[in-house]
């Protein structure tokens, strides 16, 4: 007797079907990996904002409290140096206070980017506003740095004498405020770069 063999034909997937499925799996893997590194950038963004808030707040508070009075001869004849004697320092305090307020208000948006790392709208908003805050912060810090330089060194061409030998505490506070302001400028610049990298498509 001869045994009958039964052949079962299994339809093979066409090459076009295989080509159609493979990219979908690859896309899913890329999507997950993109969300992971973007969440990491968002967490770093949040921490940098906290550091920028501390630096900007310290700069505004230090400059706003810079005041020194020198008595001469009698208590009725005194020389005083204060930040509000110079419009540049007044602009510095106001500008840095605005930057500090913005950074505080931007924290919830930074949290949103952590929860939803692939969301584009909050990251784009932060990029635009961070750039504006960076410009304002840089302008205030640079202008104040020029005045602090004159206070320390003077200018012989215009007969502007240095005052830091007499008003040492005042110059120390204003110099510290400028250093803190430039620290916040650095943090904001990094925040702008992070936002730009996060907006890059995977």
From Swiss-Prot:
Keyword tags: Cell membrane, Cell wall biogenesis/degradation, Membrane, Transmembrane, Transmembrane helix
Positions in the Cytoplasmic compartment: 1-40, 112-130, 198-202
Domain of life: Eukaryota
Xref: Pfam families: CASP_dom
Family: Belongs to the Casparian strip membrane proteins (CASP) family.
Biological process per Gene Ontology, one example term: cell-cell junction assembly
Name of protein: Casparian strip membrane protein 4
Transmembrane parts of this sequence: 41-61, 91-111, 131-151, 177-197
Spans within the Extracellular topological domain: 62-90, 152-176
Statement: the UniProt record of this protein carries the keyword Isomerase: no
Database matches in NCBIfam families: A_tha_TIGR01569 (TIGR01569)
Principal location: membrane
Oligomeric and partner information: Homodimer and heterodimers.
Subcellular location: Cell membrane
Mode of membrane association: Multi-pass membrane protein
Annotated InterPro entries: CASP/CASPL, CASP_dom, CASPL
Role this protein plays: Regulates membrane-cell wall junctions and localized cell wall deposition. Required for establishment of the Casparian strip membrane domain (CSD) and the subsequent formation of Casparian strips, a cell wall modification of the root endodermis that determines an apoplastic barrier between the intraorganismal apoplasm and the extraorganismal apoplasm and prevents lateral diffusion.
Cellular component terms per the entry's GO annotation: Casparian strip; plasma membrane
Organism: Arabidopsis lyrata subsp. lyrata (Lyre-leaved rock-cress)
């Amino acid at each position: 007797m001869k045994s009958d063999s039964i052949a079962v034909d299994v339809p093979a997937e066409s090459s076009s079907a295989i080509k159609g499925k493979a990219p979908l799996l690859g896309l899913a893997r890329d999507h997950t990996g993109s969300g992971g590194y973007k969440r990491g950038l968002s967490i770093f963004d949040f921490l940098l904002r906290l550091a920028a808030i501390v630096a900007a707040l310290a700069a505004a508070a230090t400059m706003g409290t810079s005041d020194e009075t020198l008595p001469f001869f009698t208590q009725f004849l005194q020389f005083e140096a204060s930040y509000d004697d110079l419009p540049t320092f007044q602009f510095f305090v106001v500008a840095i206070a605005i930057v500090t307020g913005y950074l505080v208000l931007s924290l919830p948006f930074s949290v949103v980017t952590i929860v939803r790392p692939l969301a584009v709208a909050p990251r784009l908003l932060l990029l635009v506003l961070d750039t504006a805050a960076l410009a304002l912060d840089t302008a205030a810090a640079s202008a104040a740095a020029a005045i602090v330089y004159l206070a320390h060194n003077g200018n012989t061409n215009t007969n502007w004498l240095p005052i830091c030998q007499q008003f040492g505490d005042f110059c120390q506070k204003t110099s510290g405020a400028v250093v803190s302001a430039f620290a916040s400028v650095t943090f904001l610049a990094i925040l702008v770069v992070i936002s730009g990298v996060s907006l890059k498509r995977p």
